[in-house]
Every structure is written in structure tokens, then in C-alpha cells.
Amino acid sequence: MASCAEPSEPSAPLPAGVPPLEDFEVLDGVEDAEGEEEEEEEEEEEDDLSELPPLEDMGQPPAEEAEQPGALAREFLAAMEPEPAPAPAPEEWLDILGNGLLRKKTLVPGPPGSSRPVKGQVVTVHLQTSLENGTRVQEEPELVFTLGDCDVIQALDLSVPLMDVGETAMVTADSKYCYGPQGRSPYIPPHAALCLEVTLKTAVDGPDLEMLTGQERVALANRKRECGNAHYQRADFVLAANSYDLAIKAITSSAKVDMTFEEEAQLLQLKVKCLNNLAASQLKLDHYRAALRSCSLVLEHQPDNIKALFRKGKVLAQQGEYSEAIPILRAALKLEPSNKTIHAELSKLVKKHAAQRSTETALYRKMLGNPSRLPAKCPGKGAWSIPWKWLFGATAVALGGVALSVVIAARN
């Protein structure tokens, strides 16, 4: 495995197993120069210096001393002759994001005419992972993932699109583009920058979801769900939500292939799991409306799903809807009376709801200008009772007067 440190001089050793193309070129140049120098010395013994440039014929130095500048010039030119040959793989580091935290260097270029993968294609890579000190911690000969789906660490998702098929590259990545503050136990410690040696083997188009069989859909959705779980464990809730969304898309997309009843039931169970996990990720991100929608979708399929009931109650509580959250948590507790988590959450919400009602009562009293007491049933009833009585009385008197006038007019 190659070292993560950037070579300080052009003559520094290259990674093990990588042909030292640059070193071979330098050695070839030196050998050619030495051979030509020997031939020049033999020719100089036989020549009368008629081959030298006109500058050496000025006559100031002796003839023996004039031979040295010409020989050095020819040696310099001879050493430069091999350089017009096709250049080997570039040694320069490409700063992918412009912040110096994610860099790529080509070790072995892809064959002529090879193409680069695009988002949505399924790629296969050979991956060797090392720490900054050169300690190899992981090797995966056949790592398969969908480009752009966040199935792997961001360092791979961002660097592989810049590689040709058949290319081998070195990628150095800061921990934020790898496994972050959690690391990956037991081999990758927290906040570890990594050095990745990547060989892009193949790149093919992704599957057509409509043409997948039931078992292929289950396998694809399970892979995306597992990727989401890995992101969730690293507290990367944005990527986790993205993976769960992709799993749900694989399950719910239209199908042109018939499925058995067992496969449909299996997909439904998998959809419920993904929706529950998606709601958990959205709750961590404070996306309450989206989390509420995910929980409601679960409850449409399974009205007694305890996880969905509990999370829906938490979402409503976060929105301040205690009067709606408490009945939902009570329903969840009825399904699982021994659940201490639901007990604690319900007790907390009841206290918050009581405090909320007390605050609202004090606010009503302040608005009505009567802080001493508040009518039990309808705040504000006393303030409007007298005016309405006067209004009804005046209306009755007016109607009575009209009726009396009609009667008198009829008699006349």
C-alpha cells in the first residue's frame, strides 16, 4: 500500500506494485547520455574539432580546453532527447473540492479510449484503505456500489467519477469525507484521515426498476436500508434519510414483472421498516412535517405499530401539540404497558401540557383584565352577557311596538 504522504521530490519511491515509470525514464536518459559521452570522447581523439560550434573557434583558449564546453553541451542535449516521448501518468495531485481535504493522484492511467462512469451507474472497484501512517486497515477486491447513491463514504462517491475505467488512483481524504468522529470500529479510529488506493474495474448502467423480480427488489431495498443504517450509526442523518428514500423507491416503483403474494408481503414489511427508520432520521434533523408524514404512512399499513405511534407522539410534542400527542402515546402504552421509554415520554408530556394550560389561563386573564378570577367554562362570557341582554330586550320592545301598531291599524 502506498503511503498517504505526498512525495517531496520527484525521485521519491512510488507505491509498491506500481511500475516506476518516471524512474525508468530518468534512468534511460542517464544511460543514453553516458553512452553518447563515451562516443564523443572517442570521436574527439580522432577529430580535428571541425564539428564544434563556431563559438569555440575564437582562438582564445588552447584546443584541449575548448573540447570541454562542446562536450558538456552535447551531453546536456543528449540527456534531453528522451523527454519528447509520451508522458507517463501525471504525478500532480488534483484538489477535488478546492479545500485541500480531498485529493486524487493517478498512479496507473486507464487504457486509451476508456470512459468515465456517471451518476446512477453501478461500479466495481478494488479498494485498499490505509491510515495516514501507512497502516493498511481494509482491502476489498470487489466493492460494488451505485455511483451517487451515497452507498459508500463520500471520498469514494466524489473521486470515482473522476477516474477512467481501468485506472488506479491514490485518494487522500479528511475524516469528514470518510467515517467522521465515530470512526469504524475496530480498525478505523475516530477523526481518522484515510489514504485510499482505488482501481476502477467496471462501470455498467444501473438496473431498470420496472423489470426487477420480487426477490431482486427485496435484495436492492435491503442493500439501501443497510447503507442507511450505517449512515445513521455514524450520526450522518442526511445520508441515512437519502438511503432510506432510495430503498422505498425501489419497493414502491411500478413493476412489469409479476410477484408472488409472499414477495409482496415481504416488500410491505421492508417498506414499513424503511419508513420507520426514515421517520427517525427526519426527527433527528428536526424535519417534523416530513417525520409526521412518514409515521402516518406506517400507521396506514400497521395501525398498531408501536414505533410509529411513539415517534408520531414525539413529533406532535415537538410541535407543541400536547393534546394530540398524549392520546397517541397512551395508545402505544396500551399496546406495550411495560415499555419504560413510553412511560417516561408520556409522563413528561402530561407535565408539559399542564404547564401549557396554566400559561394559557394566565394569558386569558391578562387579556380580559380580570386577574382575580376566570369563569370556568367560557372565558369572556361575563364581559358580553349584559350587552346581549340589553340587545335582546330592545329587540323585543321594538317587535311589540310594531305588532301593536298593526293591530290598531287593522281595527281602524
UniProtKB/Swiss-Prot annotation:
A GO molecular-function descriptor: disordered domain specific binding
Assigned EC number: 5.2.1.8
Region (Disordered): 1-68
Binding annotation for Ca(2+): 149, 151
SMART domains in UniProt: TPR
Disulfides per UniProt: none
Pfam family, one: FKBP_C
UniProt biased composition (Acidic residues): 22-50
Uppermost EC category: isomerase
Topology of this chain in the membrane: Single-pass membrane protein
Result, substituting residue 149 to N: Abolishes calcium-binding and reduces affinity for BCL2
Effect of residue 151 to N: Abolishes calcium-binding and reduces affinity for BCL2
Cofactor section: Ca(2+)
GO biological process, one term: negative regulation of apoptotic process
Gene3D superfamilies cross-referenced by the UniProt entry: 3.10.50.40, Tetratricopeptide repeat domain
Note: Binds the immunosuppressant FK506 only in its calmodulin/calcium activated form.
Main function: Constitutively inactive PPiase, which becomes active when bound to calmodulin and calcium. Seems to act as a chaperone for BCL2, targets it to the mitochondria and modulates its phosphorylation state. The BCL2/FKBP8/calmodulin/calcium complex probably interferes with the binding of BCL2 to its targets. The active form of FKBP8 may therefore play a role in the regulation of apoptosis. Involved in the inhibition of viral infection by influenza A viruses (IAV).
Name of this chain's protein: Peptidyl-prolyl cis-trans isomerase FKBP8
Species of origin: Homo sapiens
